[in-house]
Amino acid sequence: MSKKVVILGSGPNRIGQGIEFDYACVHAVFSLQEEGYYAVMVNCNPETVSTDYDTADKLYFEPIVFEHVMDIIEREKPEGVILQFGGQTPLKLALPLQKNGVKILGTKPESIDKAEDRELFRELIIELGLKQPPSGTARTKEEALKIAKEIGFPVLVRPSYVLGGRAMRIVYDEEELKEYLEEAVSVSHERPVLIDKFLDNSIELDVDAVSDGKDVLIGAVMEHIEEAGVHSGDSATSIPPYSLSKEIVEEVKEQTRKLAVALEVKGLINVQYAVQNNEVYVLEVNPRASRTVPFVSKSIGYPLAKIATKVAIGKSLREILPEVFERLEKGEAHFASDFLPKEKKIFSVKEVVFPWKRFPEVDPILGPEMKSTGEVMGIDKEFGLAYYKAQLSAGYRLPEKGNLFISVADRDKPKILELAKEFEKLGFGIYATSGTYKFLKEHGVNAKRVLKVSEGRPNVVDMIINGEIHLVINTPSGKREKSDAYYIRRACVQFNVPYYTTMRAGYAVLEAIKSIKKLKEEGKGLSVHSLQEIYNI
């Protein structure tokens, strides 16, 4: 009988934990079978591929809770258990399983604990000489207000006991913080609230890497197209980064290597960073598969979950991927990924899919709480075209002419100017409500004023309904009431008008429209290639 290994899946799908983890579990099963192991899958979701009867050698359809998992282990007597592919759910079982004599394959439970525990992790960051945004933990309302004042607004607040960014909020002033503490969470000694300095106007990055404890291979450095503060699962992302310098990307890769070695990671690691004024800050480290693993694997042509599984059962990266190390040692690696050759000039853009149409009352706005339920991908040699393809796949057909409606929060007004002028050059009519209109007019943009919903009719929502507005850029003001902005966004969803709620997404749209217009002027259309062709381009 072959050696047995148990893989724990991610349990039921929910917003924040979806099918991406199932992808990693299935690849882990295939990898074990390639190495001659008997793969035992434990999961409880009928919607997944890992629970197909012919995927693993044996399937247990059981909840991912300690008692059930322990019963299976006692019955199967495996060599060990792999936890790192099921997201956060199985990770919580690491210490209880180890205490009961179960061998955890891959990253040790102590290392998982060090990455998950805020105090231990802060000590590690200081020890490695890295930077982290200032933060604090509050157990009373008074303590929360005191910490927020010391750190300085805006702050990111969240309960310490939730996953998937639920109940997280960016708070811009004391009044808003009081409201959040009264309405959204109950702060107490048992349920503390975590408060972090929110790095306004920063760029967020995600890194997926594989480590064997000595060597670390960077799968990809991904740049979020939305600003920091939008949940990583809701942001469009680009491989390689499209607006960061090579030096920053190399620094991020180096910091990821340090963290993976210090945490003695054996398998996958995901690190999230924010870059503000050319300074790199570590936001969080997950010593497990992240939801970007399928996207990265398809972008680089290497199955990260398969590689990580081979590492978890004791193989070294140099054994598994000699050709990648050869390329690295010759200095021939792509700047944002150790796996890709230097000449690989391809952009992959991931865009997310939202269920807004199924929930007519939900405000379709992005924030630290995850709301997306799927994702698509666009690949091309230019960032603009890759982004255009991703929008098309997500169901947004970007207009090449027509009218653009702009309404932004005061803090975004200086950034809107260049964007409005560029759209004007492309032949778009610019419409705006009073505040934004006044600002644009004063700075030489030929904008037209349109009424807010509260100012009477015909207003901006009427224009959207009548098909007179073809694109909307509307950033939130920080307040959550059902404002004019809410009705604008809902009308866009209802009438299929592409709308964007962050400035960086607005600039990415501009880049996409410029690229597609240029392509058409040259008499060409979008090129379509299979992934197999792309790896050989």
Swiss-Prot record:
Query: What residues does the MGS-like domain cover?
Result: 396-537
The alphabetical list of record keywords is: Amino-acid biosynthesis, Arginine biosynthesis, ATP-binding, Ligase, Magnesium, Manganese, Metal-binding, Nucleotide-binding, Pyrimidine biosynthesis
Give the Pfam families listed for this entry.
Answer: CPSase_L_D2, MGS
Which annotated residues bind Mg(2+) 2? E284, N286
Instruction: Name all ATP-grasp domain ranges.
Output: 122-313
Q: Where is this region: Carbamoyl phosphate synthetic domain?
A: 1-395
Record note on quaternary structure: Composed of two chains; the small (or glutamine) chain promotes the hydrolysis of glutamine to ammonia, which is used by the large (or ammonia) chain to synthesize carbamoyl phosphate. Tetramer of heterodimers (alpha,beta)4.
- Name listed for the protein in its UniProt record: Carbamoyl phosphate synthase large chain, C-terminal section
Organism per entry = Aquifex aeolicus (strain VF5)
The gene coding this protein: carB2
